[in-house]
Amino acid sequence: MENCRNIFNISARHGWSVSMENMDGIQFLNFKRKTSSGVPFCFTIEAGDGTAGCIAKEIFSFVSAVVPEQCAREWMIQSGAMEPTEFLQAVADMEDVRLRAWLLALELAAMNARYNVLDTIPWDRLN
């Protein structure tokens, strides 16, 4: 993987712990951190060609797929949580995770001059 140490260092600087996994010859990266309320969270991406640009693109894809309210509902169903404040905290946690993943992807994208950072902005979600 291109600049593997740089990718891991940048991830750590953004609060993510990263591990690599090989399944049937395909490289995957697991990103882990605790949410702002202390709940463990992780997501996994395929490393593709291993370049910072490819990894950034996969993270941007994850970020664009995350819908905080939907994730909070799923978490409440799985955990058995019932309080409205728990739902609001779960939504806030997912918004924070999405933001932190997006910031990580921006910095990784900046490592790759061929990657257009403007393509990563979710224009349809901006007010």
Predicted segments — roles?
Residues 1-35, 96, 104, 111-125:
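Negatively charged, low-complexity tracts enriched in Asp/Glu with abundant Ser/Thr
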Residues 23, 29-32, 48, 60, ...:
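Intrinsically disordered, low-complexity regions of eukaryotic proteins
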Residues 36-90:
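Intrinsically disordered, low-complexity regulatory segments enriched in Ser/Thr/Pro
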Residues 43, 80, 99, 124-127:
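Residue-level signal for functionally critical sites in structured catalytic/ligand-binding pockets
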